[in-house]
């Protein structure tokens, strides 16, 4: 009888230990899920590039990490790559900040003017030079290629908004078409390319 009692007690102890371990695993998984949710909701989130509008700097299929907290601390700046919601199309766009509140924007062909000062754009310099070498404009002529245009004639960026352009000026639906992007629509700044692995890098944000 004592031996049976001891064996029974030992078995109960093992079951109790296994139960406690399962509970701990469940707790850890729940905490992990909650942390992932909070991080994605408030701090960082993934984004997949879809389309040619940011070529030559970003390609379709590249996966980025978007910093969602930075613009809660400060306002967007010229040259930063941002992801924002486009409610009318129920999707997100990735573009580059060109104008901030108070800036007057003018785009004529490949010449960008901010507050009537011509601005160099190093992030597309080589692409512009390659087009010019072939006797072409990088920003093809068209009804909505320049700014202002018939779709959007207001040149000065209002408070609580930004003016954003795609790097691929020939093929980009951006503020020339959809107008200014409000602060509420901005998701965050694209900070890291994490896929494919051979392109893993921090994204460079240019300044004037």
Question: What are the functions of these language-model segments?
Answer:
Residues 2-22, 38, 47-48, 56-208:
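Soluble "head" domains of membrane/secretory-pathway proteins
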Residues 27-42:
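Hydrophobic membrane-insertion alpha-helices, especially the h-region
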């Amino acid at each position: 009888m004592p031996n049976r009692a001891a064996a029974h007690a030992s078995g109960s102890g093992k079951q109790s230990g296994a139960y406690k371990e399962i509970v701990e695993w469940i707790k850890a998984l729940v905490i992990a899920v909650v942390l992932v949710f909070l991080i994605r909701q408030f701090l960082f989130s993934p984004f997949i590039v879809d389309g040619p509008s940011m070529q030559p700097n970003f390609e379709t299929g590249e996966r980025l990490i978007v910093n969602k907290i930075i613009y809660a601390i400060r306002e967007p700046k010229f040259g930063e790559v941002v992801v924002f919601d486009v409610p009318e199309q129920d999707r997100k766009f990735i573009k580059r900040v060109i104008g901030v509140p108070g800036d007057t924007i003018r785009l004529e062909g490949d010449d960008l003017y901010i507050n009537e000062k011509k601005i160099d754009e190093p992030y597309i310099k080589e692409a512009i030079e390659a087009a010019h070498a072939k006797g072409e404009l990088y920003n093809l002529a068209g009804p909505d290629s320049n700014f202002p245009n018939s779709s959007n004639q207001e040149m000065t960026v209002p408070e609580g908004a930004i003016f954003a352009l795609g790097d691929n000026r020939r093929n980009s639906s951006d503020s020339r078409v959809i107008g200014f992007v409000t602060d509420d629509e901005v998701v965050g700044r694209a900070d890291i390319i994490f896929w494919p692995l051979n392109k893993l890098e921090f994204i460079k944000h240019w300044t004037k």
